[in-house]
Regions:
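Short aromatic-rich membrane-water interface segments that cap or initiate transmembrane helices
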Residues: 15, 19, 34-41, 192-203
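Membrane-embedded alpha-helical segments of integral membrane proteins
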Residues: 158-223
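Membrane-interface micro-motifs in multi-pass membrane enzymes
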Residues: 21, 25, 49, 72-116, ...
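Transmembrane helices and adjacent periplasmic/lumenal helix-loop junctions
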Residues: 92-95, 114-152, 168-178
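Short hydrophobic/aromatic helix or loop-helix immediately within or flanking a transmembrane segment
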Residues: 21-39, 51-52
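Single conserved hydrophobic/aromatic residue that forms the stacking wall/gate
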Residues: 2-13
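Transmembrane-helix motifs of polytopic, lipid-linked glycan transferases
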Residues: 50-68, 106, 110
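Internal/C-terminal transmembrane anchor helices
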Residues: 224-230
């Protein structure tokens, strides 16, 4: 009986895993659900959240330093982390969103370190993969990769506009095939929030990365810290 019960539980687990991974962002959902089981242990939840946000701060700083290598801008480099920290305090925000953000930063960091010859191919291929792994955060990847090319005067900067099209096609195809319930959840960050509540702050977390990229690129013209005295 115990063996049959174990097999039954294993079958249920496999079905749940399959159903989860069939969703757009299924990997991020699965990881967040896996981590949630440890939240019953005292102080474990805050520690896990802190570790995730620390990784966000590290990866975003590494990406931004590719645009501006100045060492006197640590607070500016932390703006994406700060925006995500604030939204993480909202109970209607799912930790799935932070994990998806981490996947975005990881793939974007890899993108910034790839040689020009294959970077464009990597960008095209990784977009549908990121959509499947992490969901609509793929659009932020496409925008950020495009910004990076223009801000670093990349050789493929104009053709990189196609990233936006591929991200949109991935979302539309995913909705048509049933991986996303509707186009809103395929394109917008509402996919990472309680659908019954409005969490407007999630948009600030998405705006923060490309806006910070623009800011550090602007500050690149100054070799020394900008004087408040002019």
């Amino acid at each position: 009986r115990d063996v049959e019960r174990s097999r039954g539980l294993g079958d249920v687990y496999k079905r749940q895993l399959t159903e989860t991974l069939k969703q757009a962002g299924g990997v991020a959902i699965y990881i967040s659900e896996f981590l949630s089981q440890f939240y019953v242990v005292f102080w474990t939840g805050p520690i896990i959240s802190a570790l995730l946000l620390t990784l966000v701060a590290l990866l975003s700083s590494l990406i931004l330093k590719k645009i501006n290598s100045r060492n006197d801008l640590p607070l500016i480099f932390l703006l994406p982390w700060l925006s995500l920290l604030i939204i993480s305090l909202d109970y209607d925000y799912y930790e799935q969103g932070t994990i998806a953000y981490l996947f975005l930063l990881l793939f974007l960091w890899l993108y910034t370190n790839i040689k020009t010859r294959i970077k464009f191919i990597y960008g095209i291929c990784i977009i549908p993969i990121l959509y499947g792994i992490a969901g609509p955060i793929v659009h932020l990847f496409a925008i950020s990769a495009l910004f990076f090319e223009f801000l670093t005067n990349g050789k493929k900067k104009y053709i990189s506009i196609i990233y936006l099209l591929i991200a949109a096609l991935s979302a539309i195809a995913g909705t048509y095939l049933g991986y996303s319930r509707n186009l809103t959840l395929a394109f917008l960050p509402e996919a990472y929030c309680n659908p019954l509540q409005t969490v407007s702050g999630i948009y600030y977390a998405w705006y923060a990365l490309p806006m910070t990229m623009l800011l550090v690129a602007y500050l690149k013209r100054y070799k020394e810290p900008v004087s408040l005295k002019g």
